[in-house]
Amino acid sequence: MSVSFIRCNNIDDIISHVNRLSPNLIIIDSIQTIVNTDLDSLPGSPTQVRDCGQRLLEISKQRNISVIIVGHVTKEGSIAGPKMLEHMVDTVLHFEGDKQHQFRILRSKKNRFGSTNEIGIYQMNEKGLQLSL
């Protein structure tokens, strides 16, 4: 297995890389920084997030590729930007915690294929992030 990283925020370039590399997984960090230069709006705007999210959804379905989209959250804990992004995806996960505490919680807010009544508790230690049993 090989891993490729690209530093790119243009959706057309990202799609081109996907078509050339044929990956099994795409991770976008973050959707609010991706831009379609054909649109007259800023990265992170509702128009950009909707269009770029839709383009990622299309390529994932066409090529049977899993896509993980990282997004920003507001201080209140809701997903920043247009709510419709949540409706486009199958699963919404929140990773919660802060530097003052060693534990982090992975909480499911939406799961089209299963329960949202489970959480994962992780601990940050000298080995990195570890599942806490």
Annotated model-derived regions:
Residues 7-9, 71, 133:
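Short loop/edge segments at beta-strand edges and connector loops
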Residues 47-68, 72, 88-99:
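Substrate-engagement module of ASCE P-loop NTPases
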Residues 78-88:
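Short regulatory helix/loop adjacent to the ATP-binding pocket of P-loop NTPases
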Residues 1-55:
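Conserved inter-motif catalytic segment of the P-loop NTP-binding fold
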Residues 33, 58, 75:
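Residues immediately C-terminal
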Residues 28, 67, 83:
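Long C-terminal interaction/binding lobes of large macromolecular proteins
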